[in-house]
Amino acid sequence: MPEELKPTMTQNFIHDFIDEDIAQGGQFQGMTVHTRFPPEPNGYLHIGHAKAIFVDFGTAEKYGGLCNLRMDDTNPTKEDVEYVEAIQEDIHWLGYDWGGRFFFASDYFEKMYEYAVELIKKGLAYVCELTPEQFKEYRGDVNTPARSPFRDRPIEESLDLFARMRAGEFPNGAMTLRAKIDLASGNFNMRDPVLYRINHMHHHRQGDKWCIYPMYDFAHPLEDALEGITHSLCSLAFEDHRPLYDWVIANCPVPARPRQIEFARLGINYTVMSKRKLRQLVEEGRVSGWDDPRMPTLCGLRRRGYTPRAIRNFSERNGVSKAASTVEYAFLEHCLREDLNETAQRRMAVLRPVRLIITNYPEGQSETFSVENNPNRPEDGAREVTFSRELYIEAEDFLPAPVPKYKRLYPDGPECRLKGAYVIKCTGYETDAAGNVTAILAEYDPDSRGGDPADGRKVKGATIHWVDAATAVDAEVRLYDNLFTDAEPDAGDKNFLDCLNPSSLEVLPHAKVEAGLAGAEAPASFQFLRQGYFCVDNKDSAPGHLVFNRSVNLKDSFKF
């Protein structure tokens, strides 16, 4: 990753553990720190995954180590090559690279099967014929262990049945392979957990070669060990699974002994990050797709105009801890606003246009003004914008009759500045038969070029933005808001669909933007003066049909 794009890695407890491992030597003596990011290719990555990516790849970078990308494709039910490709694109977009270390868990299926056979031979696994319903009954409760009637099945019989399971002789759910561990354990994950289940389903990579698939708790430690992972960084949800992780490593003849470390997931308010719920939003047409700019998916955030640096800084500033917490969505917006304020060039765009006619400006005449592109980056220079007798301004910048504290245009009201151009004063307006304002009339001060009257008088009205009507370009502008009205839409027994925000998208099809934006292409972002930060839509925008998405407004609602 380029140095200028790297966030500053703060100290966190994972680094403390790794420092301790290195200092103590032992199995980590002289070893390169080796991590992995192992998404399941059954959906698109979201902002929560961005934190895991940051932790996995960032930790490897900190220690000069390696980080693998591994597709955890052990469940063929919803996995697809579409997601495999999207995951790679998202990680590269964030600025990380796996350096050719790209693996699929399914490529280890044969080796995993061999390890399972070894466990059976050692008397540490057996084939169980309990149905899913019976399985729950035989798990017992906290105080009462429950024993499968198949637990003492002869080793040879389990070996035979397991081979026949692989051969496809039995239907889904007929049998499982279970580890033989501790029926009295207070950790239910250790009460003879399932290692393999039957699933007659086509696999996106292995085709129909397999009809038995390893459970995550069995596959995960084996994958880590086979790849030489030193530190397996997982979400806190797997803390209770660590004893099983260690049991698998200890009882299979694997080439490495990774250490699992758990950290808290990233939670954000006003959204959901369950893949199941995100898929439901897509499949029910509640959003336009996985890349809908209101979605927390990385492709959705990218389409909305979020930058890799903003997301990395957001992930880094939230830190890494064991304590689960929910972060304000406003903080994510703050990180984007902070980045775009520094990098985005300024432009003028009128979202709800009304004509402004400067009655004392010569007809047929025009001129240009030099306007700075970004006050924070002098190296970005300036651009020329045209000015003529007819302009477009925002409809909200005019009122037929004033209201208290209104500082913009109204008949015989105070003088106002046209941004970077002239001082004007409203003299009247025109309406259609229905009484709708169709044009605003004003006069300008020819001696106020640049916005400052030659006589030094104070301009009491506001400064408003504008676009030259003669050269303006048509555009569609989409204003996005939170997808949910509830800060915790999936908390408790809430139906998250009942919390959807009916006003999360407003489309303005008749916006006018300055001529210099005619050739704008994704992923370009701009600050539209007085409006917010906008990006060119990477899906619907095209020559002759510009589409801009509001990424974030100008006002920062986040409080430190």
Language-model-derived ranges and their functions:
Residues F238-R242, D246-V248, R312, E316-G319, ...:
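Core subunits and conserved enzymes of cellular information-processing
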Residues M9-I18, A23-Q88, H202-S235:
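N-terminal catalytic cores of NTP/NDP-binding nucleotidyl/phosphoryl-transfer enzymes
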Residues Q27, Y96, A125, P171, ...:
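Intrinsically disordered or highly flexible coil/loop and linker segments, enriched in small
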Residues Y83-F109, Y115-A116, G123-A125:
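A glycine-rich helix N-cap at a beta->alpha junction
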Residues A256-C335:
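Long, charged, mostly alpha-helical binding arms that flank functional sites
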Residues P38-P41, R70-K78, G100-E110, E133, ...:
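Conserved short loop/turn motifs at secondary-structure junctions
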Residues L69, D73-N75, E118-K277, L336, ...:
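Active-site cores that bind ATP or allylic diphosphates and position pyrophosphate for catalysis
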Residues Q24-Q29, G58-L66, H92-G99, K122, ...:
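Secondary-structure transition/capping motifs at alpha-helix termini
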